[in-house]
């Protein structure tokens, strides 16, 4: 049980979302939810009880669009027991989430890839804590009428599609009539899904490494001049949905929401595996000793493992200048990374494994006030 060291002067509230908040959304607009400190039901690991007589705390976050469906639903769920904390989350993309927390423009940033040492050095508010908040996957979704629903793709085929060397769907599957042009859709903004696919292609396709000239994955898509670039997961999803012949990489939650057909990918064990919550969970189960410097689970081991899986990370300042805000933020994120994981499966995410939840909790115990005193004791 998390115990705060300071008097609770406020609770966490979120603007009521109504029924719309209960469903995932591919919108790129800000999500506003009113939440409050978790009480005994459902109960947050940091303790505390809701007190609607105290002032409201407003929290702001920005970053990965991949996390938006889960965060929207988790914040809404949290609000039902904690009605006095407002959470405004803008799905602006991982790179913006990092730059916003660096500039101290938000209470928390969100990124599919943890901040690097050079990123951390640019933070204007002091040391930053990074904690895992959800476990998702990247689907390879395609829109080809009449295409087999169990299409299998390996890394070399994907590499040649995104290098513009394979341009007709008949080259992928002989059962598909020739003459259907492949439209390769990628992220125009720096993104976690782009990083994950780049890492998978580096691991599985020498052709990709030769063409891109790197053995280090990048959040910026390395072959931006091939195919069509779109902003955020919502942009890629919309383009794939509206364009016959299109293929794109999309957070699995968005693919599920749009009822896309997704390819099975060749994993390290030699099996073709489709994205499902079970195959994503299998990837997360191999995340031993997870940390912000040891986070990569792309192309992991295990026959049932989906190779494009990832954790999403919340980024917060260790020193919280406003105690009430820091307590509210810590309680919110501790609840989302534990009890709030009950919202994962219906939206296409896998719940965080117990050992990863423990990593998140231990990270939040490091929160301090401006003098260096701990905000929570356990």
Q: Which ranges hold each PLM region?
A:
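Bacterial N-terminal signal peptides that target proteins for export
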Residues: 1-9
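Flexible loop/hinge segments at secondary-structure junctions
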Residues: 23-24, 31-378
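Core hydrophobic alpha-helical membrane-spanning segments
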Residues: 12-14
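C-terminal motif of bacterial Sec signal peptides marking the signal peptidase cleavage site
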Residues: 16-21
């Amino acid at each position: 049980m998390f115990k705060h060291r300071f008097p609770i002067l406020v609770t966490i509230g979120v603007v009521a979302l109504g029924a719309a908040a209960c469903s995932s959304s591919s919108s790129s607009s800000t999500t506003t939810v009113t939440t409050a400190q978790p009480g005994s039901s459902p109960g947050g690991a940091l303790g505390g009880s809701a007190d609607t007589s105290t002032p409201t705390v407003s929290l702001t976050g920005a970053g990965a669009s991949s996390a938006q469906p889960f965060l929207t639903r988790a914040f809404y769920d949290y609000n039902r027991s904690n009605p006095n904390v407002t959470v405004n989350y803008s799905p602006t993309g991982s790179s913006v989430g990092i730059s916003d927390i660096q500039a101290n423009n938000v209470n928390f940033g969100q990124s599919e890839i943890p901040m690097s040492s050079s990123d951390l050095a640019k933070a204007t508010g002091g040391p930053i804590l990074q904690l895992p908040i959800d476990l998702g996957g990247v689907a390879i979704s395609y829109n080809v009428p009449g295409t087999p629903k169990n299409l299998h793709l390996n890394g070399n085929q994907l590499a040649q599609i995104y290098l513009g060397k394979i341009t007709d769907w008949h080259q992928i599957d002989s059962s598909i009539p020739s003459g259907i042009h492949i439209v390769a859709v990628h992220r125009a903004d720096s993104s976690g899904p782009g990083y994950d696919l780049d890492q998978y292609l580096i691991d599985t396709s020498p052709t990709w490494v030769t063409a891109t000239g790197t053995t280090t994955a990048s959040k910026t898509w390395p072959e931006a001049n091939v195919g069509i670039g779109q902003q955020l997961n919502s942009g890629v999803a919309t383009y794939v949905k509206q364009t016959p012949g299109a293929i794109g990489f999309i957070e699995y939650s968005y693919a599920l929401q749009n009822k896309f057909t997704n390819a099975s990918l060749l994993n390290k064990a030699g099996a073709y595996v489709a994205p499902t919550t079970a195959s994503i969970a299998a990837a997360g189960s191999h995340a031993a000793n997870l940390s912000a410097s040891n986070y990569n689970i792309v192309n992991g081991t295990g026959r049932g493992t989906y190779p494009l899986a990832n954790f999403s990370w919340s980024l917060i300042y260790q020193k919280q200048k406003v105690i009430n805000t820091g307590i509210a933020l810590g309680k919110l994120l501790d609840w989302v990374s534990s009890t709030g994981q009950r919202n994962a499966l219906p939206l296409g995410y896998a719940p965080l494994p117990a050992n990863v939840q423990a990593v998140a909790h231990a990270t939040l115990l490091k929160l301090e006030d401006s003098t260096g005193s701990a905000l929570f004791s356990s």
